């Protein structure tokens, strides 16, 4: 009786998560495929800024549960503007003066200086308040910035859509690891990897997630467009990336679980079937910098990081 109830709950929860995440992925793929057009680029910038603002707000809210932190709103606004400027400079880099990509960093610097003066009379003081605010902003907004650079890093080449291909590859491999790791871990997992930090993470789920990301990377490798083949140095690296992204996505999830455990909460927010923005982004926050670094190393001279 209890096993039957457990299985039905598991199936219902998994189906709900699968449907919601699948719809989100379909929407993202459609948006990314058209992201080189001005109207879609504007939507990409708006969506990225919104994700950065919400994610930073959730991270700041967790900090607030541990410390008398007063910069939740300012951190969110700072992240949103930082990402919006990044999207603008990344998409229009070829049309703007050299070193224009430094503009978001200049903004972040002066925003931090503004917070230093604003925090003089707060309990944590300038060092504590500004340090925590800067961490919350960087933890969420920098990976999103790197994702935008991956997306628009090939706009100067004869095949500008290769950035879209890499962005979809990154999301597909990482999120497939998330979904399959969750399902197989729930259904068959017994031995826990980190019972104190994240009791739901099991060895079976971890292995299943890595296998899923490898399979997805193999699909991308086998269907690599001929027009892209010459632009991708060392195509076999896609298979290796499947393993790396499966592992990095897992640890990205573990890192966020560590923050949530410290703040004594289950989800970063209360969105149905999602949890929170950080619960959606957690694995990508670690896997995105890895793909960005790989592109810098292997696509030297082609990728504008």
Swiss-Prot record:
Pfam families the UniProt entry points to: CTP_transf_1
Localization per record: Cell membrane
Membrane topology annotation: Multi-pass membrane protein
A molecular function (GO) term: phosphatidate cytidylyltransferase activity
Residues passing through the membrane, by range: 24-44, 97-117, 124-144, 151-171, 202-222, 232-252, 277-297
Record-level GO BP terms: CDP-diacylglycerol biosynthetic process
Highest taxon in the source lineage: Bacteria
Reaction(s) catalysed (UniProt annotation): a 1,2-diacyl-sn-glycero-3-phosphate + CTP + H(+) = a CDP-1,2-diacyl-sn-glycerol + diphosphate
Pathway(s) the chain acts in: Phospholipid metabolism; CDP-diacylglycerol biosynthesis; CDP-diacylglycerol from sn-glycerol 3-phosphate: step 3/3
Main location: membrane
Keywords of this entry: Cell membrane, Lipid biosynthesis, Lipid metabolism, Membrane, Nucleotidyltransferase, Phospholipid biosynthesis, Phospholipid metabolism, Transferase, Transmembrane, Transmembrane helix
EC primary class: transferase
EC number in record: 2.7.7.41
A GO cellular component entry from the record: plasma membrane
Family of this protein: Belongs to the CDS family.
Protein name, entry field: Phosphatidate cytidylyltransferase
Organism the protein comes from: Chlamydia muridarum (strain MoPn / Nigg)
